[in-house]
């Protein structure tokens, strides 16, 4: 899998552009995830070959069950980015002035989750550390 950053729920196009420009030198795949794909496994969205796309009929059912309006904040998922590159990416995001409250790393544990499942988990963690 090529190092990838998934960009989810970015409504501010200027902020999204600034973030993409800041990350351009790293030659990392940046993928803006559209709301119709929020029910797909994040591993699939990041390009993990072993994770299959959810079928269309299932997608429509899941979309009905996942209220997108509940996703209020932006979310950034780092996949296949480790070590020094990971540190450099986070430093660059901070330096560029493009804060993203909800950040996650793709893991074996969460790669089968959809965007909303991960969002809810990050929301719980955020509330725990920032009451």
Language model: regions and residue ranges:
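Low-complexity, flexible helical/coil segments
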Residues: 40-45, 67-72, 111-118
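Noncatalytic linker/hinge segments flanking ATPase motor cores
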Residues: 45-51, 77-79, 115-124
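Helix-rich interaction surfaces within compact, conserved domain-sized segments
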Residues: 4, 15-21, 25, 86-131
């Amino acid at each position: 899998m090529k190092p990838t950053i998934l960009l989810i729920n970015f409504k501010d196009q200027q902020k999204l552009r600034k973030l993409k420009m800041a990350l351009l030198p790293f030659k990392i795949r940046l993928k803006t995830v559209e709301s119709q794909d929020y029910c797909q496994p994040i591993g699939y969205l990041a390009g993990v070959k072993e994770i299959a796309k959810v079928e269309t009929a299932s997608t429509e059912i899941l979309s009905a069950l996942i209220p997108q309006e509940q996703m209020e904040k932006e979310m950034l998922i780092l996949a296949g980015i480790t070590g020094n590159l990971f540190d450099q990416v986070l430093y660059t995001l901070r330096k560029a002035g493009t804060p993203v409250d909800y950040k996650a790393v793709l893991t074996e544990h969460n790669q089968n989750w959809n965007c909303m499942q991960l969002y809810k988990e990050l929301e719980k963690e955020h509330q725990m550390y920032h009451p």
